[in-house]
């Protein structure tokens, strides 16, 4: 009985940590996306000073939370977001509006995807369980 109680306690702690990390991940990704969404309003006017500033702000927020995301995301996902930020900064510096818009859309889509993966939804748990059974079979 003692081992069952200890096991359930450990399981409860792990579940709580999983929920906390999931909520923090979604919060941090929204903080990173906010300046990028704000930069969209300056695209039509072509105000690259504001665009560069907002892009740098988003990149700083990503860098600030990089240690946290390194513990949750795969290296491929981290590299993809970092490369997208580098492309976005380069296009903003060169004032290449079409390329900036394409890179901006790609980065926003990637961040939204990462946010959706970590949101607490029943099918995120079910997909994980199904994948575990498929990999064993």
What spans do the regions from the language model cover?
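Alpha-helical transmembrane signal-anchor/signal-peptide segments
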Residues: 25-42
């Amino acid at each position: 009985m003692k081992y069952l109680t200890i096991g359930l306690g450990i399981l409860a702690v792990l579940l709580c940590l999983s929920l906390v990390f999931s909520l923090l991940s979604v919060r941090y990704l929204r903080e990173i996306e906010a300046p990028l969404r704000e930069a969209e309003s300056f695209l039509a006017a072509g105000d690259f000073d504001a665009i560069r500033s907002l892009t740098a702000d988003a990149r700083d927020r990503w860098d600030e939370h990089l240690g946290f995301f390194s513990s949750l995301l795969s290296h491929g996902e981290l590299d993809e977001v970092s490369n997208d930020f580098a492309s976005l900064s380069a296009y903003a510096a060169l004032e290449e509006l079409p390329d900036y818009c394409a890179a901006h859309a790609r980065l926003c889509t990637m961040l939204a995807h990462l946010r959706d993966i970590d949101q607490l939804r029943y099918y995120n748990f079910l997909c994980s369980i199904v994948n575990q059974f498929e990999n064993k079979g």
